[in-house]
Amino acid sequence: MSAVIIDGKAVAARVRADVARDVAEFRAATGRQPGLATVLVGDDPASAVYIGGKRRSCVEAGMADLHQHLPADTPQDEIAALLDSLAADPAVSGILLQLPVPEGLDGAALVGRIPPEKDVDGLTTASVGLLARGLPGLRPCTPSGIIELLDAYDVELSGAPTVVVGRSELVGRPVAQLLVGRNATVTICHSRTRDLAAVCRGADVLVVAAGKQAIIGADAVKPGATVIDVGMHRTEQGLRGDVDFDAVREVAGRLTPVPGGVGPMTIAMLLRNTLLAARAAAEVGSLV
């Protein structure tokens, strides 16, 4: 029997609808409009497309689009000054610096200018520390979107043998920490893992964020397992993931497609984070 296909578009649409409703209620109750400041340095076509999608989604959710576009030759200190200004601006609920930045700029240092309470990407050292300690904070969008998908399909995480393939700072490590926070029993695999397929076959839940096309085949999947494919690779046949979809769908119990699985969740969770940041700021403001 073929796997149940996890519909990321449908789950993301529900999250977006919930956020839009909650934004309207927030604005009515507080008189404030959540604002997302996206910062794009340079004219990289792919980055421009990504930012455009985030900006449109922001407006559709009823938030203020506070976009900032800087030339590629903008000095580091000028970008830092802009980020500091946005951090101090009460109209800005969340700040997102589109990565990568142009060559010659220190992207990590620039991201570090964003205060954790406005770090809607969940990428700053402070945000990473809050996640590692299990303390409240804004979580990285793609990892939190993965958890949202698992919850939407009633995947039991507590006690579940779970394997994460990939240890990147953007997805692998944070999703492993989120899964541990849900009491899953987590193993992290990477390029030096011995007999990767054998390790993966022990998983009830398998999250693949390796950045290598079709690294996971049917031989690496336990029958009935839930498989989340985070990879995205452009090929002559279209977008493909880190999982051999056609082979794995005949073994897995649930499986995300590429495209249409994890991808749509990222912007949906960005919108949710921006609303959460706006709510937290309003609560702090009410106490001042």
Curated annotation (Swiss-Prot):
The keyword Secreted does not apply. CDD domains: NAD_bind_m-THF_DH_Cyclohyd. GO terms for molecular function: methenyltetrahydrofolate cyclohydrolase activity; methylenetetrahydrofolate dehydrogenase (NADP+) activity. GO terms for cellular component: cytosol. It catalyses: (6R)-5,10-methylene-5,6,7,8-tetrahydrofolate + NADP(+) = (6R)-5,10-methenyltetrahydrofolate + NADPH; (6R)-5,10-methenyltetrahydrofolate + H2O = (6R)-10-formyltetrahydrofolate + H(+). GO terms for biological process: L-histidine biosynthetic process; methionine biosynthetic process; purine nucleotide biosynthetic process; tetrahydrofolate interconversion. NADP(+) binds at residues 166-168, 191. Its EC number is 1.5.1.5, 3.5.4.9. Keywords: Amino-acid biosynthesis, Histidine biosynthesis, Hydrolase, Methionine biosynthesis, Multifunctional enzyme, NADP, One-carbon metabolism, Oxidoreductase, Purine biosynthesis. The keyword Amino-acid biosynthesis applies. It holds the Pfam family THF_DHG_CYH. Pathway: One-carbon metabolism; tetrahydrofolate interconversion. InterPro entries: Aminoacid_DH-like_N_sf, NAD(P)-bd_dom_sf, THF_DH/CycHdrlase, THF_DH/CycHdrlase_cat_dom, THF_DH/CycHdrlase_CS, THF_DH/CycHdrlase_NAD-bd_dom. Homodimer. Belongs to the tetrahydrofolate dehydrogenase/cyclohydrolase family. Catalyzes the oxidation of 5,10-methylenetetrahydrofolate to 5,10-methenyltetrahydrofolate and then the hydrolysis of 5,10-methenyltetrahydrofolate to 10-formyltetrahydrofolate. This is Bifunctional protein FolD 2.
